[in-house]
């Protein structure tokens, strides 16, 4: 089932996308280049924050804040059980221990009662 017509959307922006890709290929600065800095600045302005870090993956996007927060060995980090594996993996990569907590059937978010019970264990 198609929800968004990405082909139609691309048709509208194709010339600009191709132009920018050619510029990047020409200067060969693929990682952390001027375009990444521009994206981070524009996103920071858009969401009203001082800093934005562009990430290569969702796993990086989950791991970096855990590292910045100072998660270390033996720190328990509570993670919803109904999730993608990167949610737990990122905790391990940051040095912590993922502790999975049952989710609410209606919302799929962490069940507050289950969280309380898990903390008490």
What are these regions (language model features)?
Residues 1-29, 34:
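N-terminal "arm"/small-domain region of PLP-dependent enzymes with the aminotransferase-like
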Residues 16, 20, 38, 42, ...:
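Alpha-helical elements of Rossmann-like donor-binding domains used by nucleotide-donor carbohydrate transfer enzymes
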Residues 23-24, 46, 118:
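Short alpha-helical functional segments enriched in proximate histidine and acidic residues
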């Amino acid at each position: 089932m198609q929800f968004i017509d990405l082909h139609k959307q691309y048709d509208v922006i194709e010339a600009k996308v191709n132009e920018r890709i050619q510029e990047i290929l020409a200067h060969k600065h693929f990682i952390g280049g001027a375009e990444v800095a521009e994206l981070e600045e524009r996103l920071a302005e858009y969401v009203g924050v001082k800093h934005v870090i562009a990430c290569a993956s969702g796993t990086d996007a989950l791991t970096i804040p855990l590292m910045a927060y100072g998660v270390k060995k033996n720190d328990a980090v509570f993670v919803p059980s109904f999730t993608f594996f990167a949610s737990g993996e990122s905790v391990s990569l940051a040095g912590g221990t993922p502790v999975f907590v049952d989710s609410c059937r209606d919302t799929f978010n962490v069940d507050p009662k289950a969280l309380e019970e898990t903390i008490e264990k």
